[in-house]
Amino acid sequence: MAPSPAAAMPLAAEPDEVVVEVEEEEERGVKGGGGVAGLDEVEGLVVGSYCHDVLLRGGRVVGETLGGAAAFVSNVLDAASPAGASLAVVSKVGHDFAYATAAAPARHPPVLCASPTTSFHARFSDDAASAHAPDRQLRRVHACDPIYPADLPDRRFAYGLAVGVAGEVLPETLERMIRLCRAVLVDAQALIRAFDGEAKGGGAVRHVALEATPYARLLPRVAFLKASSEEAPYVGVETARRRCCVIVTEGRDGCRLYWDGGEARVAPFPAVQVDPTGAGDSFLAGFASGLLWGLSATDAALLGNFFGAAAVSQVGVPTFDPKMLQAVKQILEKAVKRPCTHINGNTFTFQRSSMHDELHKSLQEAAMLVCEQKQANSPATDNGDVCSINELTSLPS
């Protein structure tokens, strides 16, 4: 896709303009109140950059799409959150950004930088991935500017999601989010990703131990940390669960929640897998939406699993069927008589509720309808180059 005009995008601040001293911040405070009085006042903050994703199989390009966790996350939050919940997205792109008119960036415009847009090449193997093994090799080709603390809006938020993919969410930026938001949810990939030198044709994504990063000290102030089964060993679940609730996605086995004193397994949903990119991002957004609806953490993970599974049925950021979204909201309205956000930074209910099984059954029926429609409408497409659609699977980690 040819680059879109970026004249309407705000320009990024220079690095020497973005240092915010804690003492100065505490002196002047931030705009807005600290509480979440009612659902009509709930605003979320998503921090992470939009990207260019290039999908390859067998040495050839099979897809070029909008990427970046912020795109997938805002897509689900905009679609699934209860009425009255709003969203602000802080993302950075370069002048070469090719998707300014795509749905997510159009609703939540990024900040324009001199650096090129962050770009990833995802190389898929010819063999089908197992339930837990990585099904792609990811390489960062370009990296846009980091997101600095001063890039964040100067007001309070009910919740925040730190969803960096290329190291753009700096430790001081996450700390600023924690001060602005009543509760912060973090994707582990924003904390533990490292990149080999691009100068050598590398840029390969690898992981480092969370405890060895500057982010580790912030965990006690984080509400939820999401990791894939591949990332979990680097997170150190047993240590991290004593500081915050850790959610580990386990591919077609669903997910598990670990908190200090308990854990729970949450069942998956069927899916026609075409492209696993963004499954974990969509899971985290679905989970946050569940909390906004007033579900317990374990019940909210059902909504996370549902949207993670729905996301893999299309290449790139998915377009959800309006009838499916309507059905999901009707299910939630029936389960929760009046939405009352549980993202309040103080109290979370982790255990499954008495309606958990019924909620899973209802969402599973909606998921099966999506699968049947996908198989009927798209029995053979170019998307099959990315991943087989011949059998039902469940969301990847």
Curated annotation (Swiss-Prot):
EC number(s) reported in the record: 2.7.1.64
EC class (word): transferase
Active site annotation, chain numbering: D281 (proton acceptor)
Effects seen without this gene: Strong reduction in seed phytic acid with a molar equivalent increase in inorganic phosphate. Strong increase in myo-inositol levels in seeds.
Superkingdom in the source lineage: Eukaryota
Annotated binding of ATP, by residue: S228, G278, A279, G280, D281, N305
Entry keywords, A to Z: ATP-binding, Kinase, Nucleotide-binding, Transferase
Role played: Kinase that phosphorylates myo-inositol to produce multiple myo-inositol monophosphates. Participates in phytic acid biosynthesis in developing seeds. Phytic acid is the primary storage form of phosphorus in cereal grains and other plant seeds.
UniProt-recorded name of the protein: Inositol 3-kinase
Species whose genome carries this gene: Oryza sativa subsp. japonica (Rice)
